[in-house]
Every structure is written in structure tokens, then in C-alpha cells.
Design a protein with these regions (language model features):
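Active-site region of the double-stranded beta-helix
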Residues: 1-65, 80-190, 194-198, 203-204, ...
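Histidine-centered metal-chelating micro-motifs
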Residues: 68-78, 94, 211-212, 216-223
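TerminUS-proximal long segments
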Residues: 204-239
Length: 239
């Protein structure tokens, strides 16, 4: 629409989820959705005439801590309550077209502005319940597993250009970068140390839920769990 070479491919990584409550994300359309009826109800909700019946049209997908839900551009989505989500996005500041704002009002007492015209044009209507479960839910694959290390590819979808690898470690592990920048987030454990293999940068510590960047020029680096605990580090890169 805006003549860009890329779109807002993203994903939700569940940093945490309430174990005593229902936890979910909204993802993809239900089977047999009537496009015209959905648009009619969205426009009525935009005017504040009625509340949009989300669960009539959008799948409510159960999730738990450490699930990774993939969201290729054009997929209807929203995070759910009782969850803490790490959003990994190719374009975190553009291309978000809101279809409904959950009835929230602006300072003028009217529903806040949304992007319904653009949003309706960008929905991929074939991404229904079956497509969601076949392609973007539960896609984690183990790449390597030893006594002190498990390496898993958790995403992203084949249509997307960002790859995500999760390292579950109880000891030091060396990571090769394949000439691409690494953006990492500690998703389990209190802290981990990132060390240079050749002294090209000073070692630094990443704490829980913090994000750090290792430039592509580094080549290889080492992740070291601190305080003798098991950690999980999620690393995103451009593939």
C-alpha cells in the first residue's frame, strides 16, 4: 500500500502467563467469516453504536508461558489478558492498522480513531482456524540438544525475514552469527553474561526481560548463565 519493500511481520513471545487464569491470544479468523458482515459490525463499533463481537470472528488461541505465536503481516491478532508479551517485529513503529480499540474513548468522549479502511484492505482472509494451527501456532523445532544446552528454532513463519532461536542453557554456549546482527532478550533466569571470543568488546550482563544487540561484525560470542542457574535466551536475526 505504501510502496515499501517489507511489511509488519511480527510475533508474540509469552514471557509470562497467569497459571490460574485462562490465557490466550486472538489470532486469525474463524472458519467461514462473512467479510461484509464483519465490516458492518466493525464500522458500527467504530461509531460507538455497539460493541464489536470479537469472538464471533477471531480465533481465541490458548497460550502459556514460553509459547511463541507467529504473526505474518495481514493476520488479524491481539494479545489477551493475564499475559506478558514480548513483541518481535520487523517494523515496530509503522503499519499497525487497528480494526477495533475495545471500546476505549478519547478525551472527547468518542471512540478513539482507528484505521478501518486500511485494515480491511490488508486482512488476509484465508488465514482461518486451520491455517493458524497448521502454520503459526506450535511451530517450535529442536535443532540441537545436549546435557547443558537445547537450541530451538521458534519462528518466524516462512513468509517472514526474521528468524528466532531460543537457547536453553545451564552452561556456557558459543553462538555463530552468520554475518547478521543478533537482537537478544533474556526470557528466563535472572541474568546472563555475553562474552567476546576475541576481546573485540567488553563482556556485559543481560538481565531478565532486557534486550541487547550484538553487531554482525562480532562473528561469534558466548552466552554464559550467571549464578549457576538455567536460563533461556531468545535471539532474533535477519535471515
Amino acid at each position: 500500500m505504501y510502496k515499501r519493500q517489507y511489511t509488519q511481520d511480527e510475533s508474540y513471545y509469552l514471557l509470562d502467563a497467569d497459571e490460574d487464569e485462562e490465557t490466550y491470544v486472538y489470532l486469525g479468523l474463524k472458519e467461514g467469516v462473512d467479510k461484509k458482515e464483519m465490516e458492518r459490525e466493525l464500522r458500527a463499533a467504530e461509531k460507538g453504536e455497539e460493541r464489536f463481537p470479537v469472538e464471533k470472528y477471531v480465533n481465541k488461541i490458548p497460550v502459556k508461558k514460553h509459547d511463541h505465536v507467529l504473526i505474518p503481516a495481514g493476520t488479524v491478532h491481539c494479545s489477551g489478558k493475564n499475559t506478558m508479551v514480548l513483541e518481535i517485529s520487523a517494523t515496530p513503529y509503522i503499519f499497525t492498522f487497528k480494526l477495533w480499540d475495545w471500546g476505549r474513548l478519547g478525551m472527547d468522549g468518542l471512540p478513539r480513531p482507528i484505521h478501518l479502511d486500511h485494515g480491511m484492505k490488508n486482512i488476509q482472509w484465508n488465514r482461518d482456524t486451520k491455517w493458524v494451527y497448521d502454520n503459526i501456532v506450535g511451530q517450535t523445532r529442536t535443532m540441537e540438544k545436549t546435557e547443558n544446552c537445547e537450541v530451538e528454532r521458534t519462528g518466524l513463519h516462512s513468509r517472514e525475514f526474521i528468524d528466532t532461536i531460543r537457547y536453553t542453557l545451564s552452561g556456557p554456549h558459543t553462538v555463530s552469527m552468520d554475518d547478521t546482527v543478533h537482537v537478544m532478550n533474556l526470557v528466563e533466569g535472572r541474568s546472563a553474561r555475553i562474552e567476546s571470543m576475541d576481546g573485540s568488546f567488553a563482556a556485559f550482563t543481560v538481565h531478565y526481560a532486557e534486550t541487547a544487540i550484538v553487531p554482525a561484525a562480532v562473528g561469534t560470542y558466548r552466552i554464559v548463565p550467571e549464578e549457576g542457574e538455567m536460563i533461556r535466551m531468545l535471539v532474533a536475526s535477519v535471515r
